[in-house]
Swiss-Prot record:
Database matches in PROSITE patterns: GATASE_TYPE_1
EC assignment: 4.3.2.10, 3.5.1.2
Glutamine amidotransferase type-1 domain segment(s): 3-212
Location(s) in or outside the cell: Cytoplasm
GO molecular function: glutaminase activity; imidazoleglycerol-phosphate synthase activity; lyase activity
The protein's name: Imidazole glycerol phosphate synthase subunit HisH
Organism: Pseudomonas fluorescens (strain Pf0-1)
The reaction(s) this protein catalyses: 5-[(5-phospho-1-deoxy-D-ribulos-1-ylimino)methylamino]-1-(5-phospho-beta-D-ribosyl)imidazole-4-carboxamide + L-glutamine = D-erythro-1-(imidazol-4-yl)glycerol 3-phosphate + 5-amino-1-(5-phospho-beta-D-ribosyl)imidazole-4-carboxamide + L-glutamate + H(+); L-glutamine + H2O = L-glutamate + NH4(+)
GO biological process, one term: L-histidine biosynthetic process
Gene: hisH
């Protein structure tokens, strides 16, 4: 049976992610902060919620920045929400934070004066929104284009390499909802909270060989 390591660095509701993975038959799901267990896993999931400064402080304290660089190179790897944002170069949050830098680009604030067609938009962006699939990726298998996923975020990703944007969203501004490169895939939305389409994405991840 394959193993899926859900990286635990003290930030995020990891059990909901683990339960969703178990629900789709992903294999043996391990919530762990043990680097050896993470290195031995067949697949790795990197979730996260909260302030990016706190997240990055814990990631660096535990040595997970270098570990994430290592394990995301040679097996299927999925970043979720702040776990995705941590993979970028930097974030504007908390007066600026350097991140892991696996994907070029920056995490930017939606702003307090966000408008669309004369309507003021609340920040954080919270709720269901469409994701436009930019390319045909294995993790989009059996998920229709413009499927709706569940988002909760005040900061959005401005990708540095448009070719890595495999899914985009819009909330006052266009933003990268999904990034991919090699065996790495990352999403701003919460698949574990996104019902049918979110579970399908996790099922696709569980079956993906990491090639793209």
């Amino acid at each position: 049976m394959q193993t899926v390591a859900v990286i635990d660095y003290g930030m995020g509701n990891l059990h909901s992610v683990a339960k969703a993975l178990e629900h789709v038959g992903a294999g043996k799901v391990l919530i762990t902060s043990d680097a050896a267990v993470i290195r031995e896993a067949d697949r790795v999931v990197f979730p996260g919620v909260g302030a990016i400064r706190d997240c990055m402080a814990e990631i660096r304290r535990l040595g997970f920045d270098s570990l994430v660089r290592e394990v995301s190179q040679d097996r299927p790897f999925l970043g979720i929400c702040v776990g995705m944002q941590a993979l970028l170069d930097s974030s504007e949050e908390n007066d600026g934070v350097d991140c892991i830098g696996l994907f070029p680009g920056a995490v930017k604030f939606f702003g307090k004066d966000l408008h669309e067609d004369g309507e003021h938009l609340k920040v954080p962006h919270m709720g269901w929104n469409e994701v436009k699939q930019a390319v045909d990726h294995p993790l989009w298998h059996n998920i229709p284009d413009l499927a709706r996923f569940y988002f909760v975020h005040s900061y959005y990703i401005a990708a540095g390499n448009p070719r890595q944007v495999v899914g985009s969203g819009h909330y006052g501004v266009d933003f990268a909802a999904a990034l991919a490169e090699g065996s790495r895939f990352a999403v701003q939305f919460h698949p574990e909270k996104s019902h049918t389409h979110g579970l399908q994405l996790l099922q696709n991840f569980a079956a993906w060989d990491g090639r793209w």
